[in-house]
Amino acid sequence: MHGLIADFIHYLDVERGLARTTQVSYQQDLTTFMAWLSDQKQTTFPEDFGVIQAFLKHQNDTKAPASVSRMISALRKFYRFLLREGAIKSDPMTKIDTPKKAQHLPATLSGTEIDALMAKPDTTKPLGLRDRAIFELMYATGLRVSEVVGLRLDQLHLAMNLLQVTGKGDKERLVPISPQAADWVNRYLQESRPRLIKHQQPKAVFVNFHGHALTRQVIWKNLKAYIASVGIEKDVTPHTLRHSFATRLLENGADLRVVQELLGHSDISTTQIYTHLSNQHLVAVYHKTHPRG
């Protein structure tokens, strides 16, 4: 069973060209599936619809709808692969419907909360200056955390206030960066990064104390710690900075298509969730400013 999963991941990489982050997510989902099958004394990947249904019911009881949807997507592709390779005779996933994602409004940070967060890292220390540069960059550009950790030195064009970003599906886009955020990144590059990389020559812009490329998990953990230390009680993740970036743009009159391009969304319907947030802002402004509001 391990071998089939490894073959599938290799297929996703070589033949489908899926992004590494997607490959890792699918591998984790299939490993979870295999562990559950082992608990059920199953030694092969089942073709029985009922077994798949029981597994997904277990997942629904313990995981968020978005995670279950991704799990179904992984299983659907995996079973197609197994059928193609002759490892199974029938595909039970054809009977499984993908649940509709519940659309929820993402959390955002106010201007005051952003200021409090930015002021928290100790910029007299290498790691503090690095963290400030990361937060300034994320809020100024709306980059995904995976795009931040994947950012290379040769993708920085700070003199032109531009970044060359590799997004989902390895699609590249140019993203503008504010002069303020560019200044913080420059400070990090000049003052902190040389002290962190020591004698190494990593291509990654952002590195850890040992000079290795930073991970998404470290940024997530550090952000959580800073948020807690300034007393913000919202459930804040790196994606919250991306949400806040998009919401501020729309509140200040940016065109939805422009925001779509900046965020790297392939489908504008993904971007449209932010219009609900900006509409809330419009209603609040109306009630505050209109004489009969």
From Swiss-Prot:
Residue ranges annotated for the Tyr recombinase domain, each copy included: 104-287
Highest rank taxon of the organism: Bacteria
Protein's recorded name: Tyrosine recombinase XerD
CDD domains documented for this protein: INT_XerDC_C (cd00798)
Molecular functions per Gene Ontology: DNA binding; tyrosine-based site-specific recombinase activity
Record-linked HAMAP family: Recomb_XerC_XerD, Recomb_XerD
Lineage, broadest ranks: Bacteria, Bacillati, Bacillota, Bacilli, Lactobacillales
Major localization listed first in the record, in broad terms: cytoplasm
UniProt entry tagged with the keyword Glycoprotein: no
Organism, scientific name: Lacticaseibacillus casei
One GO cellular component term: cytoplasm
Keywords carried by this UniProt record: Cell cycle, Cell division, Chromosome partition, Cytoplasm, DNA integration, DNA recombination, DNA-binding
